[in-house]
Design a protein with these regions (language model features):
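A short alpha-helical cap/connector motif
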Residues: 1-121, 125-150, 154-239
Length: 239
């Protein structure tokens, strides 16, 4: 499949109808300063959790020389219903697997060989245990200068108990989103250099550098305050 060159990462996300762009998170604001430096290089990119394949399409578009690898359980959307999985592309490979599987590293090596990834992007299960377990399985396959991104992490480090009580996901699943499990996850990153990016709606209803018109078609930001409350990214690098 030939991918038409698009100017910016935001345009790629928007064209692919990915929620990483203007449809929801605007994660391009975090990614592009890192991605543009290697945009035209040959490297390996691993994405964990692809759902309908929109972000895979965007990354194939944005990185013309990269090879994109994907892992998903495909429980919500089988690969037969994902266009990218059914159209041959020499730059895209996928594997049906659970990213928390203790044998995942071996399965990836069996499928793809002794490969190293310069970018690993975890967009899988968005609670703390699977984020930690996925990191433990996939980080050994990160290159020395690679970057590991974890999306949609509820930032309990920035939230009070009162904040958490107002978020239905955190109230409904207290075990999945406990502070103890958050702390356990953070502890597993201690040997890494970490940067935590906050892409959430601000309390006053605005995000820095993004206008209402660009973000939400002119609708008030406060309408979005809860459902993008997990819009943070943690970037991990080798020290």
């Amino acid at each position: 499949m030939e991918h038409k060159k698009t100017t910016t990462l935001l345009e790629c996300f928007n064209k692919a109808l990915s929620d990483k762009g203007i449809r929801k998170h605007l994660y391009n604001e975090v990614y592009e300063p890192h991605f543009e430096k290697i945009r035209h290089e040959e490297f390996n990119f691993l994405e964990i959790g692809i759902l309908r394949g929109a972000s895979v399409d965007a990354h194939l578009d944005y990185f013309p020389n990269a090879k994109i690898y994907a892992i998903d359980t495909f429980e919500r959307k089988p690969p037969t219903q994902i266009r990218t999985c059914n159209e041959p592309d020499p730059r895209f490979k996928w594997l049906k697997a659970d990213s928390t599987d203790p044998y995942l590293t071996a399965k990836m090596q069996e499928a793809w060989g002794d490969i190293k990834f310069d970018i690993i992007l975890d967009d899988g299960a968005h609670w703390f245990d699977p984020m930690r377990l996925t990191f433990e399985q996939c980080s050994p396959m990160m290159s020395e200068k690679g970057k590991y991104f974890i999306e949609d992490m509820w930032p309990l480090c920035w939230m009070t108990e009162e904040n958490c009580a107002k978020i239905w996901q955190l109230s409904k699943f207290p075990d999945k989103f406990s502070r103890a499990k958050f702390d356990e996850m953070i502890k597993s990153f201690e040997h890494m250099k970490t940067t935590h990016y906050d892409c959430r709606v601000k309390p006053e209803g605005h995000r820095i550098g993004t206008s209402d018109k660009d973000r939400n078609g002119g609708k008030p930001y406060l309408e979005l305050a809860e459902w993008i409350g997990d819009s943070t990214i943690m970037m991990l690098e080798n020290k």
